[in-house]
Amino acid sequence: MRGQQAPPQQPTRVRTPRENENEVLGVIEQMLGASRVRVRCMDGKLRMGRIPGKLKRKIWVREDDVVIVTPWEVQSDEKCDVIWRYTKGQVDWLNKKGYLDFMR
């Protein structure tokens, strides 16, 4: 298998936003530095997101990544926490199922 690429696999399970926990899909528009990002959310709001340390150490978050965010209880229209980042295969699945219609 050396030098050969494995065929793309369908994701077996994709995490979707939990509405009872106030989670929203979003797309990272801009990296601001100091673990902060600007996120365009599916409810039409532009929020400043914070990447928590446990997520920051595990995965890299870049511009145009699709993420799940939770708005803060105070200043919920302005600030949020990034809690999940989707891979390319998961984004394709979300697109097919209609979750990413807000991006169009």
Swiss-Prot record:
Residues 1-20 are annotated as: Disordered. SMART domains: eIF1a (SM00652). Residues 1-14 have a biased composition (Low complexity). Pfam families: eIF-1a. SUPFAM superfamilies: Nucleic acid-binding proteins. Residues 12-87 form the S1-like domain. Keywords: Initiation factor, Protein biosynthesis. Belongs to the eIF-1A family. This is Translation initiation factor 1A. It comes from Methanococcus maripaludis (strain C7 / ATCC BAA-1331). The gene is eIF1A.
